[in-house]
């Protein structure tokens, strides 16, 4: 260990490597708005719930291995309880008997919470166009990111996670409490995603991704 003393009326001595103490201090202190720090921390610490429904879960579990290393994106903390998680990946076929269980688990997630629909079966029912399969998890849950494929590769899930992180990093944190003439009140902050869910469910035509419209 190396140390040195510098008088207050003297110029700080340069550290090994040519850096002064001011330069080293500038590299280790971050100045930002509180909202920016909250969004930065939130998007880089998404905790997924360890939950799977069908074969897509195999690809999801593979994304946590060292070969794909989902820990690079801050999502390596897999929680066994939905009360300790804020991300739920619907990976697999959602049967009608399983839908109430999925909804119950979603309600127990921590706020703010997000949903990734992984695979064709979760997105639209896949090839199971029958009475016993829900034709898309967005019929009863608000979905943030859709990952296509049957099944999607782990890289596709990581791409969906990066898209979710980008969206979370742009979310403005609403005011939680407002002081008014009636005292402290909680301001209503409805989710725009939830408000648009009914409109999106009624959509029958999608824009061509290669068009200029």
UniProtKB/Swiss-Prot annotation:
Keywords: 4Fe-4S, Cell inner membrane, Cell membrane, Iron, Iron-sulfur, Membrane, Metal-binding, NAD, Quinone, Translocase, Transport, Ubiquinone. Binds 1 [4Fe-4S] cluster. Residues 191-213 have a biased composition (Basic and acidic residues). Its main location: membrane. It catalyses: a quinone + NADH + 5 H(+)(in) = a quinol + NAD(+) + 4 H(+)(out). The keyword Cell membrane applies. Its cofactor is [4Fe-4S] cluster. It is found in: Cell inner membrane. Pfam families: Oxidored_q6. Its EC number is 7.1.1.-. It is an enzyme of class 7 (translocase). GO terms for biological process: aerobic respiration; electron transport coupled proton transport. One of its GO terms (cellular component) is plasma membrane. Belongs to the complex I 20 kDa subunit family. NDH-1 shuttles electrons from NADH, via FMN and iron-sulfur (Fe-S) centers, to quinones in the respiratory chain. The immediate electron acceptor for the enzyme in this species is believed to be ubiquinone. Couples the redox reaction to proton translocation (for every two electrons transferred, four hydrogen ions are translocated across the cytoplasmic membrane), and thus conserves the redox energy in a proton gradient. This is NADH-quinone oxidoreductase subunit B. It comes from Methylococcus capsulatus (strain ATCC 33009 / NCIMB 11132 / Bath). The lineage of its organism: Bacteria, Pseudomonadati, Pseudomonadota, Gammaproteobacteria, Methylococcales. The gene is nuoB.
């Amino acid at each position: 260990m190396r140390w040195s003393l510098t008088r207050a009326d003297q110029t700080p001595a340069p550290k090994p490597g040519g850096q002064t103490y001011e330069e080293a201090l500038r590299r280790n202190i971050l100045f930002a708005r509180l909202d920016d720090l909250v969004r930065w921390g939130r998007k880089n610490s998404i905790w997924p719930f360890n939950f799977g429904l069908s074969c897509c879960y195999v690809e999801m579990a593979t994304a946590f291995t060292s070969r794909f290393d989902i820990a690079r994106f801050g999502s390596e903390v897999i929680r066994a309880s939905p009360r300790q998680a804020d991300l739920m990946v619907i990976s697999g076929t959602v049967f009608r008997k399983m839908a109430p269980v999925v909804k119950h688990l979603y309600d127990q997630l921590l706020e703010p919470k997000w949903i990734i629909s992984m695979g064709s079966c979760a997105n639209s029912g896949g090839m199971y166009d029958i009475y016993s399969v829900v034709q898309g998890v967005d019929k009863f849950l608000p979905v943030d990111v859709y990952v296509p494929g049957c099944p999607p590769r782990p890289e596709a899930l990581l791409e969906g996670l990066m898209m979710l992180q980008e969206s979370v990093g742009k979310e403005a944190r609403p005011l939680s409490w407002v002081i008014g003439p009636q005292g402290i009140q909680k301001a209503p902050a409805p989710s725009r995603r939830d408000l648009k869910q009914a409109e999106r469910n009624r959509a029958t035509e999608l824009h061509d991704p290669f068009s200029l419209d």
